[in-house]
Curated annotation (Swiss-Prot):
Keywords: Molybdenum cofactor biosynthesis, Phosphoprotein, Pyridoxal phosphate, Transferase. Ubiquitously expressed. Pathway: Cofactor biosynthesis; molybdopterin biosynthesis. HAMAP family: MOCOS (MF_03050). GO terms for molecular function: lyase activity; molybdenum cofactor sulfurtransferase activity; molybdenum ion binding; pyridoxal phosphate binding. Residues 527-546 have a biased composition (Polar residues). This is Molybdenum cofactor sulfurase.
Length: 882
């Protein structure tokens, strides 16, 4: 990241100056009260949040849900396939919603039919199955399916259905469609008797926001513009899912044959409901094989006799539609009209925000003149006719190298800015804009990169980008908070400090947590630095911690430290320095409850999954979803202590009475349930109502404590390194990836020095050594001599125990959480990112090899660590443990 004095390229573009310089009139807001009032009244849950993923889904207003719930509470809606009074009400209401949808798109039941589906993807699949394809024969070439390469995966996936019908698929590049010569209607020839073809293209690219001409619909259908040189009649499917969320669509003018949509893109609620708008002139040609409930006029169970219903909608809506969700659409339309005045107002408002952000973002420069971002677009954001409220980009460093989108996403999360990263289910546009060849896509797959993961750079080349998008409730403050975030993390002021971000309570600032701010962390067993490395006046910050536990002596873990007891710092001081090249264990930590506070020990037994009872429990919400400090930072204030003699875990927290949980389940009483950790299914059991009530009281919401079942074996998902054989696959507790995490004090010391240089002279040190160690939540701490030397290790030996190094840990934003208070500070992540050249790696994962548990095995503070280096070892990045 660049430093140095402020310069014009680091300034935030004033909105007033932008409006004055615009060549066209721009509209911001809706002219009926302030947008801030609308946000406060309808979207109060967005306080402190910058939501910029409206292309993924927009957000619903509070009044929409309130109105819908009132409707449900006042009316009885029965199954529309029945004939009773409540069912008749449902049927009539659903039909009114169909009319409302058609009116929204400026058409009528005479021209179009609304077929409800589960979403636009299901609508596309329906078209692929029902279109009247003609297979090639001896007398003709048959139908063809053409699609713009800048299309969603769900469009491209239609080719698998057409291929089964022996129908050819032809991808068409946007530039080829743009340059296709227009013909007059006479030159196009008579399509009578020729096979039908289908051309699919998006009204708006979900990757870049490019808006393709709606005039293509009429030109292709009339034969004046051909996607491919095939004789026959052309039909057009307009993928409007991304477009209609922020723009009006007039089907009386642009009469596409098929228009798939998803309603959550427009209203935010309901999800799981979409529609296919079918031009009635084509409806009679559609074919259907399967028939479900409600679609038959008559059929025989014992003979192949079936007559479909006459209504196109009833013929294709198999089974009972999601009628309550359909009824919810009425309240969505009402809210949208009431709050904004209509889609044209939304189009103007969202485009103004996008054009401003694009202008400001593209003007940012490093002191050497290099751009801060690379924007992927086919337009100059000159008009909403050619560009939607979407900006796809990658952040660059001052040498022009791409900063991985995963890192940008993590940094944005620290500021509570919600963006989308990757290729957005649009590989064609991703390849085109990023210059990724077909061969590179296959190579990336072989390297382990799949759609939707966080592998953002391969050989320095980006595999995707960052996307921001605006919705009707987006504000100027959202746009400016995002721009300030880019400026603050990429450009610096004259003092070397980041430019100011939003203040608490303002858009873009993390929400204030008064409970966390006022919480005083109780004494807990944690690590401390060795004397030669931490000589600051704050080195005794944890001197009130209880003594670290010796598993052999089984010191009672709940005893507070006294003058006669040896403190953690004193025990660390007993570790011999030895040769400069030697490494010893200075601290051992286990984390009995995933994402909760550490429990420090002096000597501890090993189990088949790592340190005994390390991450054997986890806290889940009322839906059984595992919680981490990313969602609930105050988890770090929950302090577990393991008492091996009494076979219990004692849990403490500030303001709460200690509570005990048995280490093992009662097999006769326990009820096994299933949960997930990093997409892995795990068998667990609930630890009971008593601890659940305790947790719920502390956090103020219903939580449960669950433990991994002792007879359930969970294997690591993949092998790491070249030489690891299948029989060495590790068994895991509730960790994400590996059994152990090791960090090196020299690496911590370098990070500490970097953070110290950011402080003004004489300012109190913000990051003592112990504070930093606790943030990385490692099991094994060593006193290495060189920063990050552990990443070069292949194996280590600790006494008779051997451990394989699986690779570096790729860190997430959890390292920004102070483990004593639960408060966030993004400096740690940012500085580590600078030091590690865009990849936030810290610590290495270990797996024990050939562990014989027939006799007890222990790790101890003071044990010598002997690393083994191997040249040309490959290690893949592994996500952080929690």
């Amino acid at each position: 990241m660049a430093g140095g004095a402020a310069h014009p390229g680091a300034e935030l573009l004033p909105f007033a100056r932008f409006l004055d310089s615009s060549l066209q009139p721009l509209v911001y807001g809706y002219g009926r009260g302030t947008l801030h009032e609308l946000r406060a009244r309808e979207f109060g849950r967005l306080a402190g949040t910058v939501y910029l993923d409206h292309a993924g889904t927009t957000l619903f207003p509070q009044s929409q849900i309130t109105s819908f719930m009132k409707d449900l509470m006042e009316n009885v809606y029965g199954n529309p396939h029945s004939q009773n009074i409540s069912s008749k009400l449902t049927h009539d209401t659903v039909e009114q919603v169909r009319f409302r949808i058609l009116a929204h798109f400026h058409t009528s039941p005479e021209d179009y039919t609304v077929i409800f589906t589960s979403g636009s993807t299901a609508a596309l699949k329906l078209v692929a199955e029902a279109f009247p394809w003609v297979s090639p024969g001896p007398e003709g070439s048959g139908s063809c399916f053409c699609y713009l390469t800048d299309s969603h995966t769900s469009v491209v996936g239609m080719r698998k259905i057409t291929a089964a019908m022996n129908v050819s698929s032809i991808p068409v590049r946007p530039e080829d469609m743009w340059s296709a010569e227009r013909q007059d209607a006479a030159a196009a020839g008579d399509p009578a008797g020729q096979p039908p073809h289908l051309f699919c293209y998006p009204a708006q690219s979900n990757f870049s926001g490019t808006r393709y001409p709606l005039s293509w619909i009429g030109e292709v259908k009339s034969g004046r513009r051909r996607p491919a040189s095939r004789p026959g009649k052309w039909f057009v499917l307009l993928d409007a899912a991304a477009f209609v969320g922020t723009s009006p669509l007039d089907l009386s003018v642009h009469q596409a044959d098929f228009v798939p949509i998803s309603f959550y893109k427009i209203f935010g609620f309901p999800t799981g409901l979409g529609a296919l708008l079918v031009n009635n002139r084509l409806a009679a040609l559609l074919r259907k094989t399967y028939f479900g409930g409600g679609t038959a006029a008559a059929y025989l169970a014992g003979d192949d006799f079936y007559v479909p219903r006459e209504s196109v909608a009833e013929r294709f809506e198999d089974g009972t539609i999601s009628f309550l969700d359909v009824i919810a659409l009425k309240h969505g339309f009402d809210a949208l009209e009431r709050l904004t005045g209509g889609m044209e107002s939304i189009r103007q408002h969202t485009f103004t925000l996008a054009q401003y952000t694009y202008t400001a973002l593209s003007s940012l420069r490093y002191p050497n003149g290099a751009p801060v971002v690379q924007i992927y677009s086919d337009s100059d954001f000159s008009s909403p006719e050619v560009q939607g409220p979407v900006i796809s980009f990658n952040v660059l460093d001052d040498h022009g190298n791409v900063v991985g989108y995963s890192q940008v996403d993590k940094m944005a999360s620290l500021h509570n800015i919600h963006v989308r990263t990757g290729c957005f289910c649009n590989t064609g546009a991703c390849q085109r804009h990023l210059g990724i060849s077909d061969e590179m896509v296959k190579k990336h797959l072989q390297a382990g990169h799949v759609c939707g993961d966080d592998v953002d750079l391969i050989d320095g080349q980006p595999t995707g980008s960052v996307r921001i998008s605006f919705g009707y409730m987006s504000t100027l403050e959202d746009a400016q908070a995002f721009l300030r975030f880019i400026i603050a993390t990429r450009l610096h002021s004259s003092h070397g400090q980041p430019l100011p971000l939003a203040t608490p309570g303002e858009a873009g600032a993390p929400p204030e947590d008064s409970e966390a701010q006022n919480a005083v962390p109780a004494a807990r067993a944690r690590g401390s630095s060795s004397p030669q490395e931490d000589t600051s006046p704050h080195s005794g910050v944890w001197n009130n911690s209880p003594t670290a536990v010796d598993a052999e002596g089984l010191c009672p873990p709940l005893l507070e430290a006294t003058g006669t007891q040896q403190t953690t710092s004193e025990k660390a001081a007993d570790v011999p320095d030895g040769d400069l090249r030697s490494h010893v264990i200075t601290n051992l930590f286990l984390y009995p409850i995933k994402s909760c506070a550490a429990f420090e020990v002096i000597r501890w037994p090993l189990g088949s999954q790592g340190l005994l009872y390390d991450r054997s429990w986890m806290v889940v919400n009322h839906n059984g979803i595992c919680l981490s400090q990313k969602q609930e930072p105050r988890l770090c204030l929950i302090q577990p202590f393991i008492d091996l003699q009494r076979r219990i875990m004692v849990i403490k927290a500030q303001g709460m009475e200690p509570i005990e949980v048995p280490l093992e389940e009662n097999s006769e009483q326990v009820q096994i349930c299933q949960s997930k950790v990093c997409a892995d299914r795990v068998n667990t059991y609930d630890c009971g109502e008593k601890i659940s009530n305790w947790l719920s009281k502390f956090f103020g919401r219903p939580y449960h404590l669950i433990k991994q079942s002792s007879d359930f074996q969970r294997n690591a998902k993949k092998k790491h390194g070249k030489d690891q054989s299948a029989h060495t696959t590790a068994t895991l507790s509730l960790v994400n990836e590996a059994q152990y995490l090791l960090i090196n004090r020299s690496s911590i010391l370098e990070l500490q020095q970097q953070l110290s240089t950011s402080c003004e002279n004489g300012k109190e040190e913000l990051f003592p050594m112990n504070n930093l160690i606790s943030r990385f939540r490692a099991n094994i701490i060593t006193n290495g001599t060189r920063a990050f030397e552990e990443e070069k290790w292949d194996e280590i030996s600790i006494g008779s125990l051997r451990f394989q190094v699986l690779g570096p840990c790729h860190r997430c934003q959890m390292i920004c959480i102070d483990q004593q208070t639960g408060q966030r500070n993004q400096d740690v992540f940012q500085k580590l990112s600078e030091r590690r050249e865009r990849k936030v790696k810290f610590g290495v994962y270990l797996m024990h090899t050939s562990l014989d548990l027939s006799s007890p095995c222990y790790l101890s503070v003071g044990s010598q660590v002997l690393p083994l280096l191997k040249e040309n070892m490959e290690h893949h990045d592994i996500p952080a443990t929690e």
